[in-house]
Amino acid sequence: MTDVLLCVGNSMMGDDGAGPLLAEKCAAAPKGNWVVIDGGSAPENDIVAIRELRPTRLLIVDATDMGLNPGEIRIIDPDDIAEMFMMTTHNMPLNYLIDQLKEDIGEVIFLGIQPDIVGFYYPMTQPIKDAVETVYQRLEGWEGNGGFAQLAVEEE
């Protein structure tokens, strides 16, 4: 059983570096049996590598504007990503990436961390660093949604 953690984001853009920071923490001191991939700002480039691992579970972590307080963490239903037109800094919408992978992977979990400041050369804010630490600590023994709440998408 292979679990893959895909960390997404740009460490040069303030809070968008949440994913890469998580990848760094895992590289320094692994938690659980996750195969960690730092997808950076072009995670679509890792589709083939992820498929070759044939994971049972894929956890994608990214800073995502969900309209919450900075540092809040939510599980986002992959089907909601396109509808919400989530603001990400990546070349390709993450729902495309998920659609490419979910045929081959049993479980795809998308975990969003609400950023505060996303801009070139801004430092990462403390609430985001704290959120990354929370996610990192929960990786070992991760079950289901890792104890994180599901994002409630408001009906228009």
Swiss-Prot record:
<feature type="binding site">
    <location>
        <position position="90"/>
    </location>
    <ligand>
        <name>Ni(2+)</name>
    </ligand>
</feature>
<keyword id="KW-0064">Aspartyl protease</keyword>
<dbReference type="InterPro" id="IPR000671">
    <property type="entry name" value="Peptidase_A31"/>
</dbReference>
<protein>
    <recommendedName>
        <fullName>Hydrogenase 3 maturation protease</fullName>
        <ecNumber>3.4.23.51</ecNumber>
    </recommendedName>
</protein>
<dbReference type="InterPro" id="IPR004420">
    <property type="entry name" value="Pept_A31_hyd_mat_HycI"/>
</dbReference>
<keyword id="KW-0645">Protease</keyword>
<comment type="similarity">
    <text>Belongs to the peptidase A31 family.</text>
</comment>
<dbReference type="Pfam" id="PF01750">
    <property type="entry name" value="HycI"/>
</dbReference>
<keyword id="KW-0533">Nickel</keyword>
<comment type="subunit">
    <text>Monomer.</text>
</comment>
<feature type="binding site">
    <location>
        <position position="16"/>
    </location>
    <ligand>
        <name>Ni(2+)</name>
    </ligand>
</feature>
<comment type="function">
    <text>Protease involved in the C-terminal processing of HycE, the large subunit of hydrogenase 3.</text>
</comment>
<dbReference type="GO" id="GO:0004190">
    <property type="term" value="F:aspartic-type endopeptidase activity"/>
</dbReference>
<dbReference type="InterPro" id="IPR023430">
    <property type="entry name" value="Pept_HybD-like_dom_sf"/>
</dbReference>
<dbReference type="GO" id="GO:0008047">
    <property type="term" value="F:enzyme activator activity"/>
</dbReference>
<dbReference type="GO" id="GO:0046872">
    <property type="term" value="F:metal ion binding"/>
</dbReference>
<dbReference type="GO" id="GO:0016485">
    <property type="term" value="P:protein processing"/>
</dbReference>
<keyword id="KW-0378">Hydrolase</keyword>
<dbReference type="GO" id="GO:0004175">
    <property type="term" value="F:endopeptidase activity"/>
</dbReference>
<feature type="binding site">
    <location>
        <position position="62"/>
    </location>
    <ligand>
        <name>Ni(2+)</name>
    </ligand>
</feature>
<keyword id="KW-0479">Metal-binding</keyword>
